[in-house]
Amino acid sequence: CNAIVKEAKENNLTHIFWTESDMILPKDVIPKLLQLKKPIAAGIYFLRGGTGQPCLYKKTPLEIKENPYLHTPITMYDERGPFKVDCPGMGCALMEMGVFDKVPEPWFDLKSNDLGKTNGYGQDLYFYTKVRWAGIEVWVNPSVICDQIETQIVGYKDYRRRLMEGRGLGGGFIGLDAHVVDK
C-alpha cells in the first residue's frame, strides 16, 4: 500500500480509492463518496461470517502503550445520513491525496500476525489510528452499501437480520425508520 501511495503522489493524483478483491461495490460508489467532500469518505461493508457485523470501528476508550491500535466494533449505525467513525476498514474508502501529506510515513504497516494478534493489528487499524492522531476526520456514507464474498455473500440483509433478532445489542431498543425497506 505504501508503494501505491508513493506512485499516486508522483503522478499528482487527487484521490486514491481503496477496495479489496472480495468486495462487491455499487456502481455509483465513487460519485457518492465524492459528494461527501471529506478527506476520507467510506462506504459500509459487512464482515465475513454472515452475522451482519459492519466493518466500522471507534477508538477504544483507553489506549494502551503496548498496542495503541485497538478499536471497538460499532454494532449499529445511523442509516439516515453521513456519520463519523475512527476506522471503516479499507474495503471501500476514498481518500484525498492531502491525507498522505498530513499522516507521517509509513502510512501502512501490517503486524496482524504478531504474537497471535495479542499485540498485532491490521494495516487499516494502524493507518486510521495515525489519521486520528493527525486530526483528520473519517466519514461514512450509509447509502454506499457493499457486500463481501466468502463462501457466501454477506451484506446488509445480514445486518438487518441481526438487528431484528436482537443479537449483539445488549438488550437495547431498536428504532427503525419508516423509509428503510429490506430488498
Predicted regions and their residues:
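Amphipathic coiled-coil/heptad-repeat helices and related helical stalk/stem segments
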Residues: 1, 25-26, 124
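Active-site nucleotide-sugar/metal-binding loop of Leloir-type enzymes
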Residues: 2-15
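Conserved catalytic core of nucleotide-sugar-dependent glycosyltransferases
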Residues: 5, 26-112
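Short beta-strand-to-loop acidic/aromatic patch adjacent to the donor-nucleotide binding site
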Residues: 12-24
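Conserved beta-strand edge residues that scaffold enzyme active sites
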Residues: 22, 47, 145-146
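C-terminal catalytic/acceptor-binding lobe
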Residues: 97-98, 102-183
